[in-house]
Regions:
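Aromatic- and Gly/Pro-enriched helix-to-coil junctions and flexible linker segments
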Residues: 6-111
């Protein structure tokens, strides 16, 4: 009898700072620069979703991002530092994760 299994190390989402309601979060100015760190792999050829500028919003919403629900969004669940399945050599800062979480929770606007 042969038994085998595999597992993924899972991480709890780090404590992320609250972003005040008065602070605007813009996809183009705040989120896309964070995503640009990921385009070595998420470039339309290697790994989905395509996170290159000009493609990323439509690749993310609504397939990977559930507008208004970061915790329920696959994209948020798989961020480096939260639960990315591979060691990508970096983790996002708590501030970057907070911006992404807030952007999704506020409706994931394409602004």
């Amino acid at each position: 009898m042969l038994l085998s299994s595999c597992y993924y190390d899972t991480r709890e989402a780090p404590e992320v700072p609250d972003i005040p309601d008065s602070e605007e979060i813009s996809f183009s100015e705040d989120i896309q620069p964070i995503l640009n760190q990921c385009t070595q792999c998420h470039n339309g050829s290697n790994a989905n979703p395509d996170l290159r500028e000009g493609s990323s919003y439509n690749a993310l919403v609504p397939v990977y991002v559930e507008e208004g629900n970061a915790e329920g969004s696959l994209f948020y669940q798989k961020l480096p530092g939260v639960g990315h399945p591979f060691d990508v050599g970096f983790v996002l800062s708590a501030d970057d994760i907070a911006r992404i979480k807030t952007w999704i929770d506020r409706g994931a606007d394409n602004n």
